Structure formats: C-alpha cells, structure tokens
Swiss-Prot record:
Keyword Ion transport: yes
Source organism of the structure: Clostridium novyi (strain NT)
Subcellular location: Cell membrane
Protein name: ATP synthase subunit b
Gene that produces this protein: atpF
TM annotation in the entry: 7-27
C-alpha cells in the first residue's frame, strides 16, 4: 500500500469535517438531551426529598394531633366517669332518703296499729271484766266456779 500524504490530509480534513457536522447535528443534541434528563432527574430527586420532608412533617403533625386527641378523649371519658359517679351517688342518696321516709312511715303505721290494738284490747278487757262481774253477781259462786270463770276470762283475753 502506498501512503500518500495528500490522501492522508484529505482523509483527516474529511474526518474533522465529519466530526464538526456530527458534533453539530448529533453530539450537541444528544448532550443537550442528556443534560436535560440529568437536570430533570436532579429536579425529581430534589422534589422527592422535599416531598419526603413534607411527609415527615405531616406524619409528626398527625402523630401530635393523635396524641392530643387521645389525651382529650381520655379527659372526656374521665369527666363522664366522674359525672356518672356523681349521678350514681345522688341516686343512691335519694334512694336512702326515700327508704328512710318509707321506714318512718312504716314505724308510724306500726305505732298507730299498736295503739289501736292496745285500745281494742283494753276495751275488750273492760267488756269481759264487766261480763265476768255480771255473771259473778248473778250466781253465787263457789271457789271452783270462780276458777273456771277466771280461766274462761284468760282464754278470751288470749284470743
């Protein structure tokens, strides 16, 4: 093979021209696309980092709200428990008062019934005594008859 300098120079010039044309039409647009894609990826990464930070802030805020709501719920439950205990104590107190009133009424009723029974017994005793005296005066009584009358009187008083 022959080496010719003019061919070699023309080949180098052609190669350089091809490089310039390729650089202008191929390498430059490809580099621009790659640069644009790199910037897009960096932007996406930065946006993802920002979104992650926001999500973390929201998670913390939600966690704090949850804790506050849980604490508030606990306070509400405790308040209702206290109110329920107060109502329960009030109901029990009212029931005790009502029971005392009923017991007092029952005692008064028993006392009235007792007084009534005593009055009736007293009247019955007087009646029986008068009847016994009447019978005693109507007959002449010996000791045996007197004992029978007393036993009859006691049995009537017992009934």
């Amino acid at each position: 093979m022959n080496f010719s300098i003019p061919t070699f120079v023309w080949t180098i010039i052609n190669f350089l021209l091809l490089l310039v044309v390729l650089s202008y039409f191929l390498f430059k647009p490809v580099n621009e696309i790659i640069d644009k894609r790199s910037k897009d990826i960096e932007g996406d990464i930065e946006q993802a980092r920002i979104d992650k930070d926001k999500a973390e802030e929201l998670r913390i805020a939600n966690e704090e709200e949850y804790k506050a709501a849980k604490k508030e719920g606990k306070i509400i439950v405790e308040n209702y428990k206290a109110k329920a205990e107060n109502v329960s104590e009030e109901i029990i107190s009212d029931a005790h008062k009502e029971a005392e009133i009923i017991i007092e009424r029952a005692k008064k009723e028993i006392q009235r019934e007792r007084e009534k029974a005593e009055y009736e017994i007293k009247n019955k005793t007087i009646e029986l005594s008068l009847e016994l005296s009447k019978k005693a005066l109507e007959r002449s009584i010996d000791e045996k008859m007197h004992r029978e009358l007393i036993e009859e009187f006691i049995s009537k008083v017992g009934n």
